[in-house]
Amino acid sequence: MNPENYLYLSALLFTIGAAGVLIRRNAIIVFMCIELMLNASNLAFVTFARMHGNLDGQVFAFFTMVVAAAEVVVGLAIIMTIFRSRRSASVDDANLLKN
């Protein structure tokens, strides 16, 4: 398969994720869209690494996955805290944690 196809797929996935972050108000959906954007960037890194014949993109994608795993833990903890206090998972309720 042509490497450009992987880059087009990566751009499409990133665009879908960015649109989801900007349009949706549910925190869990926004969180999933951010993860989709991270996976799209990983696909682009691995594709560029494959095109140039080195492993730098694959190593960077691995570290991105490690950071994404830590982000999942912290993000879900914050979403659960908002849901427990307000019974809603809307991102509009995030500023209510200040009190």
Swiss-Prot record:
One of its GO terms (biological process) is ATP synthesis coupled electron transport. Its EC number is 7.1.1.-. Disulfide bonds: none annotated. GO terms for molecular function: NADH:ubiquinone reductase (non-electrogenic) activity; quinone binding. The chain crosses the membrane at residues 3-23, 28-48, 59-79. The keyword Cell membrane applies. Gene3D superfamilies: 1.10.287.3510. InterPro entries: NADH_UbQ_OxRdtase_chain4L/K (IPR001133), NUOK/Mnh_C1-like (IPR039428). It is a multi-pass membrane protein. Its main location: membrane. Keywords: Cell membrane, Membrane, NAD, Quinone, Translocase, Transmembrane, Transmembrane helix, Transport. It comes from the Bacteria. It catalyses: a quinone + NADH + 5 H(+)(in) = a quinol + NAD(+) + 4 H(+)(out). One of its GO terms (cellular component) is plasma membrane. Belongs to the complex I subunit 4L family. NDH-1 is composed of 14 different subunits. Subunits NuoA, H, J, K, L, M, N constitute the membrane sector of the complex. This is NADH-quinone oxidoreductase subunit K. It comes from Rhodococcus opacus (strain B4). The lineage of its organism: Bacteria, Bacillati, Actinomycetota, Actinomycetes, Mycobacteriales. The gene is nuoK.
